Design a protein with these regions (language model features):
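Surface-exposed amphipathic alpha-helices with a cationic face
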Residues: 84-105
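N-terminal [4Fe-4S]-dependent radical SAM core
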Residues: 1-23, 28, 36-43, 176-177
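Core AdoMet radical
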Residues: 36-51, 63-78, 98-121, 131-145, ...
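Short cysteine-rich clusters marking metal-coordination/redox-active sites
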Residues: 31
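Short, charged beta->alpha transition segments
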Residues: 53-61
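Charged helix-capping and loop-helix junction motifs
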Residues: 49-53, 82-90, 119-127
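Short, flexible, glycine/charge-rich loop motifs used to bind or transfer phosphoryl groups or to couple energy/partner
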Residues: 11, 58-59, 125-128, 154
Length: 181
């Protein structure tokens, strides 16, 4: 059963432009100082139903929506991968069928290198696929001692150890490329 914590239908804080943000339910990182502790429990939140999905599609299809952000919880936790993949697939379908300009953002406590390197203990093909389908990921666990409330170091990240990776440029250049926004 797929679970989510909440949907922000009009969001300007979790990525560039106006977007929709879906907070998945469940995270095993439990970062000290996390702003979203209510999303830690994999059994908490709400069930992702056909009715919720229909509402989500309508929210994402609005002409002024330029971004989908998936965060949590941990979108790349094994338990959350089915929902994360479903959200990315819906967004991709909307982009293709509506010829919509929309960017896909994903927040994760994993690092980009851990996700895409098959030698990493955190590697899984389904986790890597979710990242490959995204335009940008904000990677790394939140670290309270590196908290940046002004976004003076990394815009859209909670702590200075986190990075915004331009996934498609990274794939193209075969190296980690940071977002230049």
């Amino acid at each position: 059963m797929m679970r989510y914590a909440r949907i922000n239908s009009l969001d300007v804080t979790n990525g560039e432009d106006v977007g929709v943000s879906v907070f998945v339910q469940g995270c095993s990182f439990h970062c000290p100082g996390c702003f979203n502790k209510e999303a830690w429990d994999f059994n908490g939140g709400k069930e992702w139903t056909d009715e919720v999905e229909s509402k989500f599609i309508k929210l994402l299809s609005r002409p002024y929506i330029k971004r989908l952000t998936i965060l949590g919880g941990e979108p790349l936790a094994e338990q959350n991968l089915p929902l994360t993949h479903r959200l990315l697939q819906i967004a991709t379908d909307i982009i293709l069928t509506q010829k919509k300009q929309m960017k896909l953002w994903l927040y994760t406590g994993y690092t980009f290198e851990d996700i895409i390197s098959y030698k990493s203990p955190n590697y899984s093909p389904t986790r890597a696929k979710a990242v490959i389908l995204s335009d940008y990921i904000v990677d790394g666990k939140f670290e309270i001692d590196k908290q940046d409330l002004t976004y003076s170091v990394v815009k859209y990240a909670g702590s200075t150890n986190q990075r915004i990776i331009d996934v498609q440029k990274s794939i193209e250049e075969e190296r980690t490329v940071l977002w230049e926004g």
